[in-house]
Amino acid sequence: MKIESAEFYKSVTRLEDLPKDGLPEIAFAGRSNVGKSSLMNTLMGKKDLARASATPGKTREINFFLVNGKYYFVDLPGYGFAKVSKSLQENWQQLMEGYLKSRAELKLIVLLIDSRHPALPIDLEMNEFLSFFGRRFAIVRTKTDKLNQSALAKSKRESEKAFYDFEFIMDFSSVTGKGKKELLSVLSTYLTS
């Protein structure tokens, strides 16, 4: 897949505001500071299209990016920071559950994990959450440029052992671009199936 155009489409805080045009979606999920914005920007070929919040865990909306005018890349709120009120956490959970339960257009969720921390409890909880809703998801390990080959291989084995029900697992570096072509190729098959 070649991305020729990508633009911000809309932010959503309520399920009734989700796009109604029926275009297929790939959603990106991950804990705060995992490199989700960097990965999405690298895939879309834009430096600052998907923006990271200045305060980790602050973003509480679902952001839609129209890609090639044919499908959406969806930036889900980062999880894992408790520096927000309980009511805001509950609203986020309701929004996420509603989106994951009912979204027919959602073809795949890409769960990002930091390759330096291959099996954090919070990421394993998200694995359970996605499995519970019966959604197809893949694991993309970020920040792979920060580990040497030996540590990277060990980390990948740990991830493969800890996570379950995933479609595939692959490594990605926004710094070097490693994995970009392969990930876009795989995502293309889900968008057209």
From Swiss-Prot:
For this protein, the record's PANTHER family field holds: ENGB-TYPE G DOMAIN-CONTAINING PROTEIN, MSS1/TRME-RELATED GTP-BINDING PROTEIN
BP-aspect Gene Ontology terms? division septum assembly
Annotated source species: Chloroherpeton thalassium (strain ATCC 35110 / GB-78)
Q: Which family does it belong to?
A: Belongs to the TRAFAC class TrmE-Era-EngA-EngB-Septin-like GTPase superfamily. EngB GTPase family.
Binding positions (Mg(2+)): S37, T59
Role according to the record: Necessary for normal cell division and for the maintenance of normal septation.
Which NCBIfam families does the UniProt entry name for this protein?
Answer: GTPase_YsxC (TIGR03598)
| Pfam families xrefs | MMR_HSR1
Q: Name one GO molecular function term.
A: GTP binding
The record, for Gene3D superfamilies, names:
P-loop containing nucleotide triphosphate hydrolases
Which PROSITE patterns does UniProt cross-reference here?
G_ENGB (PS51706)
Q: Name one GO cellular component term.
A: cytosol
Q: In its UniProt entry, what is this protein called?
A: Probable GTP-binding protein EngB
Q: Where does GTP bind?
A: 30-37, 57-61, 75-78, 142-145, 172-174
Q: Which residues form the EngB-type G domain?
A: 22-193
For this UniProt record, give its keywords in alphabetical order, as a comma-separated list: Cell cycle, Cell division, GTP-binding, Magnesium, Metal-binding, Nucleotide-binding, Septation
**Which cofactors does this protein require?**
Mg(2+)
Cross-referenced CDD domains = YihA_EngB
Q: Which domain of life is it from?
A: Bacteria
